[in-house]
Amino acid sequence: MGMRNIEMSAILTIDFDIIMAPSIELYNNLIGDQKGVNKIIKQFPLLEYTMTADFFIYEAITRELVKLFKRLPAEKVFFISEHHTLLKLVEDLDKFELFNVDHHHDIGYNKTTPTTKILRPECGNWVKYLSDKDRINEYIWICNDNSDMPTTGLHKAYLTEPINIKEFNFDSVRDIQKLIICNSPQWIPANIQALFMSWVGIAEEYYGKDFKIT
């Protein structure tokens, strides 16, 4: 990992779809704004048996979450459904380093270029939206082996560095202002959703309070 200002306030966000590396590319390009993976499964039921998660990544992140809960007070931990709803949670913060553990880079897709204005932030472009508002000091994307890299222009303009999830050191993230854990149900088969709820359950047991998924 390259040089960075470890004193800069940080947002660490984890998208649950990071555990779907073994199968997400089977349906990745079939999911539009209104069509989640479970709608695809309804049309093609046998697909569900091919949609597996990487349980090694799940287990590793679960261990890291327990360590993070020990570092952070409950008021710095949030669970959300859609990744772009993170925007409301960071409105009160100054510029920050953004660490995004995610199968997708969320800088923008299709014909998005550095000059494209994001009029409506959504799950695939919220990082660019924040950066264009001058809210991000550095963007560090923690991805899978088979994650699609952003186009060259977007990479140079927005991404400080991509890091493979298998090489990322969670302890390197200092001064975490908020830990935001995202469900992204449109990317997760229903039979795997229970694993996300286990993260919520661990947080609730540790902090002794209920967490809403907003």
Q: What is each residue range found by the language model?
A:
Residues 2-214:
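Conserved alpha-helical scaffold segments that buttress catalytic/binding sites
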